[in-house]
Structure formats: structure tokens, C-alpha cells
Amino acid sequence: MDQVMPIPNAVMKLLDLLPENATPYLVGGCVRDWLLGIAIKDFDIEVFNISMDKLIRILSKHGRTDTVGRSFGVIKWTPCKGETYDIAIPRKETKTGDGHQGFDIETDPQLDPRIAASRRDYTINSIMYDLRKHAIIDAFGGQSDLENRRLKHTSDAFSEDPLRVMRGVQFAARFGMCGDPATLELCRSIRNQFNQLPPERLWNEWYKWASQSRFPSKGLQFLAD
């Protein structure tokens, strides 16, 4: 595969807007889908070495910003007559309570990219793409897991959020993947915590399984395992 990712002009424009020391990465599903040869729906961006206030000031001069997600380190940026992009500052998460929302979130612009990637649920979602260098950053072997259709947790922090089990169900079904034995063991250890999750969050993952899966039985097998 050509390792230069096709990127919208509006996203590349960030390189001209941001200070030279600020490093923007594409993160999450867009990198995963590109590597799988799947059409990319959303480009999510994480910018290191810049404060949230400065990022908002810069982007507000070149489009509309929505700061409703600021407490989570995320803003939405809509360039003039363009699509909307989620742009985040790196963050650290500390488990403080039950369920999907029981976390204390602290943004840290100077966070090491490897540490930032470690909070992702599965290795296939931890792969980053450096927009300045046009280089893949794969600290946790996500590319190998994609090639081998292996669904593997990124770190032991996986067990802090039971929703990640159901995300695994729909990922397995969409991409034809099997659970890594250690990951399945972690899933079994938190399966009794589903009652901590809002029903709509569980439904959302089931909906993705039903509406987007090419291999629905793979998802059910992941859940059974």
C-alpha cells in the first residue's frame, strides 16, 4: 500500500495555521480504515504541543469552532463552507467511578504520543499518522493485528470501561476479526459490569453490529468467547 494517506485540503491547511512546534496527528478509525482500504468517513485529529486556548484562537479565525466538548479536550472545527472535524488535545484519564463516564480527564499538550495512544481501546485504533512527516506511528503493533485480523487490547486500562467489550463485538463483525486470548480474558473479567452502562450506549454498539457488519457471526463469536 502507498503509505501516503489521502487527506482533505482543509485538514492539510492545519499545517499552515498551527505553530511549527505543534504536531497534528490523524488518530483512531480514519487511520485504521485507510490501512484496511475502507473509505474514510471522519478524520479525527489530535494536536500535541499547543494549549487548548491557543488552538481555539487560531481555528476561530479560519472557521467556526464548537467548544461543547472542551472538558474532554475536544473541539469541533468547521472551516468555511467545509466539513466538521473533531480536533483534540492529548489527555490523560483516571478511573474515578463506574461505567463509561466514570473518568477524570486532564488535558496535557506535552503528553508523549505513545502514552496518548495507550488509552485507545484496541491496538487497531491506536495507530497514528503524523501529518507533518506523513509517517505512521504504531507503538502497539496495530498494523500487525490488522493484517492478522486480531482484536487485541492496547493496555490493561481496557478493563476500566465495559463498553469496550461491545465495541469489540462490532469491530469483530465489521472487519472479520477474532479476539486475542488475553483480551478475551479481560473481557470476561468485566462482563458483569454491563449494568453500569446507559442502555443507549449498548444499543449503539449493537446497531453498528447489525447495520455495518460483513461478518456478523464473528461478532457473536467474540461475545460468546
Predicted regions mapped to residue ranges:
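Catalytic cores of the polymerase beta-like nucleotidyltransferase superfamily
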Residues: 1-225
